[in-house]
Amino acid sequence: MSEEPVEIVNDALGYNVKYSLDSFLHDYNTQVTTYSGYPLFQEMESSSLDQLIKWNTARKIAYNGSILHFMRSMYQKKLKEEGFEIQFVIKKNDKETALKLKDFYGSVNYSMDDSINIVEITPNQNQVAIIYKDEESSPLYLEANPEASAKFQLSVVNFLPKESLAIEQNGYYYEQNDITI
C-alpha cells in the first residue's frame, strides 16, 4: 500500500494521473501480478488547438479495442457493431484452438438486471478470445510478437470457473481479480 499517490505524466494522451495504490501482489507459482487502486485523471491544459486535437486522436486510438471499450460494448449488447468478436479457446491434445460462436451473448450467459443497471456474464468457457477487427495491430506490437495477426487485435481473457462478472454501464466491472488478461 502506498502512502502517497504515484504520479504519472502521460504526454501522449494529455493526462496527469495520480494513482493511489491499494494492493500489489505477485504469485510466483502462477507468475500472475495483480494490483488495485484508485486512479485520478486530470487533463493537461494546452492553448494549442493542434495539441488538443493530437491528444483527442491519441485517446480515441487508445480507447478503441481496450478492455473498457469491450465492457461497454458487452453491456450495451453491441459487440459486433463496435468491431468485437468473441471465441472460446479450447485445449485439445495439448493444442489450443478457437471455437467460433454463433450467439455471443448466449455463450456468456448474458443477463441484465434493469433494477440496478448491472449486466452479469458467466462464460461457458474459462478462456475467451476477444478479437477487435476495426483496428490493425501496431507495427511495434507486431515487431515484438511476430506470430500475431496484423489484420486485427487479439486478447485472451481468463475467467474464474463458474464465476460471474458484473458490468456497469460505464464499463466498470467487478470483481476485477476474477479475470486475467
Region spans (language model):
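Surface-exposed, low-complexity/disordered segments
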Residues: M1-I181
